[in-house]
């Protein structure tokens, strides 16, 4: 991986280069053809949180979102790596309550809030973080909603669970690839590996969804619209992807710990 990586970004301090960042990048058009690449577009990697919109696709396309009356706010939160500010955790709590569930039904672990005020409030109240404070609790609430819809078992993060099978199907449909394997993400859910080009194709598929009329594409449009309507729920105040979505109108920018992807319609 590192031998084929190329120089992407330099950080300078004064007149001296302080650090150099290397990696891989690829741009594809709506047909999935490579427009420009740096490094190896066939590099296999984990897209992690930047592909939560793919993981949310079965939630909408299955009819689960409509059955349980999910709003655009719920759908945006299902795609989130949020700060655990009150706007995030209150919505997750209400969502779980409407499902007849609670914090203990989430398979993600507890996590200290990234939001400063929420962190201080917990400290002042001498309370420990809960699972709703996990930055992936929105995604997991979406998983629980789909679990309820499918009448499946409680261990929705198992690789053999119908929810995770639906997620893999969504990945392979949008990337037009077969995943070579999976790993367990920090929130306990499986994350499937694909090529960089494959994930770029998936983002292009989302970006071009309005030109198609099938159920999956209509669901993708709904997901993108939800993220653009509520960028503060996708991450939070001061976060790069939230600010970028506000500034670059019409573009969705889900961020991960290692990269950021930009699904956007190519101008004609």
Task: Place the predicted regions along the sequence by residue.
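Active-site-proximal alpha-helical segments within enzyme catalytic domains
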Residues: 190-209, 219-226, 260
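Residue-level preference for non-acidic, small/hydrophobic
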Residues: 52-56, 199, 258
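Conserved small/polar residues in nucleotide/adenosyl-binding loops
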Residues: 258-264
């Amino acid at each position: 991986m590192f031998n084929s990586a190329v120089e992407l970004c330099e950080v300078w301090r004064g007149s001296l280069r302080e650090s150099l960042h290397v990696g891989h990048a690829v741009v594809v058009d709506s047909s999935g053809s490579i427009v420009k690449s740096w490094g190896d577009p066939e590099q296999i990697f984990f897209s992690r949180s930047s592909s939560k919109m793919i993981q949310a696709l079965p939630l909408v396309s299955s009819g689960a979102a409509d059955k349980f009356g999910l709003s655009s706010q719920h759908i945006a939160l299902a795609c989130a790596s949020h700060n655990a500010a009150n706007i995030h955790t209150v919505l997750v709590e209400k969502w779980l309550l409407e499902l007849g569930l609670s914090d203990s039904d989430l398979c993600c672990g507890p996590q200290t809030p990234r939001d400063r005020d929420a962190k201080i409030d917990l400290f002042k109240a001498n309370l420990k973080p809960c699972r709703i404070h996990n930055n992936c609790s929105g995604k997991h609430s979406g998983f629980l909603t789909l679990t309820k819809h499918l009448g499946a078992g409680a261990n929705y993060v198992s690789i053999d669970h119908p929810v995770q099978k639906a997620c893999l199907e969504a990945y392979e449909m949008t990337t037009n690839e077969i995943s070579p394997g999976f790993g367990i993400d920090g929130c306990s859910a499986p994350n499937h590996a694909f090529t960089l080009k494959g994930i770029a194709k998936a983002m292009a598929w989302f970006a071009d969804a309005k030109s198609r009329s099938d159920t999956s594409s209509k669901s993708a449009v709904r997901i993108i619209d939800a993220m653009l309507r509520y960028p503060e729920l996708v991450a939070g105040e001061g976060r790069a992807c939230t600010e970028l979505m506000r500034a670059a109108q019409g573009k969705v920018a889900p961020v991960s710990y290692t990269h950021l992807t930009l699904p956007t319609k190519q101008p004609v």
